[in-house]
Every structure is written in C-alpha cells, then in structure tokens.
C-alpha cells in the first residue's frame, strides 16, 4: 500500500532505521496485546482442541474488545487500503490512455477480482471464529456450551 499509494515518501518512511523501529514497535504491541490475557485469566486449557487458548466466556467486554481490535478494525483498514490502491490504479490507467469514454477493461476487472478474492478468503477464514466470540460474549453461560466441538477441531 505505502509503495503504491505513497511512492514519493516510501524511501523515507521505510529506511533501515524506520524499518527497525517498526519491527520493535510490532514486538512491543504484541506484548501489550498479550498482557490482558495474562491478567484476566482468559488463557485456559480447552479439551476440545487439546491446547491452551483464549477462553471467550471469561469476560464479555474483553472478548468484544478482542474481536473489534483484532478483526473488525483490521478488516476496515484492509478494505480502505485495497480501495485506495484500486482507485489509484484506475486513475493512472485512465490518465495514461485518455479516451472519450473510459471503460473498465477485462484486465482491470480481473485484477480487482483477484484482490477481492484474497480479501474474501481472509474474511471467510477468520470471521467464524470472531462471530462465535461475539455470540459467546453476548451470553457466555448459555452460548459457550452450545458451540459444537467439531467446529474447533475441523
């Protein structure tokens, strides 16, 4: 995204020093994201998957926050960035080939479909887990036991 939409600023933004700072910032943010799990006791053994995992029924507010910040916000950011890239590509293509009636070409449509498929596959893979989290957060006592075991081990 940065290389395509902000090409003039890319070299300055992604210098060696700034790249190292980004890696360090990502490590710090990862640790910050893990700390609430340790403090709230949301990491518990789940016999359905034979592993220690995030227990969605411990805190409704925390589960909702996890879904919002770890799924919904990234989805909105990805949508925004894909749209910006797509609009920029179309603007450049239309500027390069001015026509009286610019139309969407098959190649442009295929590129858009490819980007859309990647996004949809990401959403399909992660949405069920997050929507289950929201369902459990809405009523932990009754919803948690109703989640089928096969959903976690499939």
Curated annotation (Swiss-Prot):
MF terms per GO, please? G protein-coupled receptor activity; melatonin receptor activity
Organism domain of life:
Eukaryota
Q: Where in the cell is it found?
A: Cell membrane
Q: Which GO terms describe its cellular component?
A: plasma membrane
Broad class of the protein's primary localization? membrane
The UniProt entry lists membrane topology as: Multi-pass membrane protein
Keyword set, alphabetical order: Cell membrane, G-protein coupled receptor, Membrane, Receptor, Transducer, Transmembrane, Transmembrane helix
Cytoplasmic compartment spans: 1-19, 84-115
Function of the protein: High affinity receptor for melatonin. Likely to mediate the reproductive and circadian actions of melatonin. The activity of this receptor is mediated by pertussis toxin sensitive G proteins that inhibit adenylate cyclase activity.
Query: Which PANTHER family does the UniProt record give?
Result: B2 BRADYKININ RECEPTOR/ANGIOTENSIN II RECEPTOR, MELATONIN RECEPTOR TYPE 1A
Give the family per the record: Belongs to the G-protein coupled receptor 1 family.
Protein name according to UniProt: Melatonin receptor type 1A
Q: Which gene encodes it?
A: MTNR1A
């Amino acid at each position: 995204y940065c290389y395509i939409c902000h090409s003039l600023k890319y070299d300055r933004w992604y210098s060696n020093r700034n790249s190292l700072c980004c890696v360090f910032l990502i490590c710090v943010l990862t640790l910050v994201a893990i700390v609430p799990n340790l403090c709230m006791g949301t990491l518990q053994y789940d016999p359905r998957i034979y592993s220690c995992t995030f227990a969605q029924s411990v805190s409704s507010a925390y589960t909702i926050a996890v879904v919002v910040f770890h799924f919904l916000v990234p989805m909105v950011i990805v949508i925004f960035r894909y749209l910006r890239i797509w609009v920029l590509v179309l603007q450049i293509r239309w500027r390069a080939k001015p026509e009286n009636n610019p139309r969407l070409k098959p190649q442009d449509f295929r590129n858009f479909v490819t980007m859309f498929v990647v996004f949809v596959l990401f959403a399909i893979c992660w949405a069920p887990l997050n929507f289950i989290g929201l369902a459990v957060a809405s009523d932990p006592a009754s919803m948690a036991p109703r989640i089928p075991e096969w959903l976690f081990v499939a």
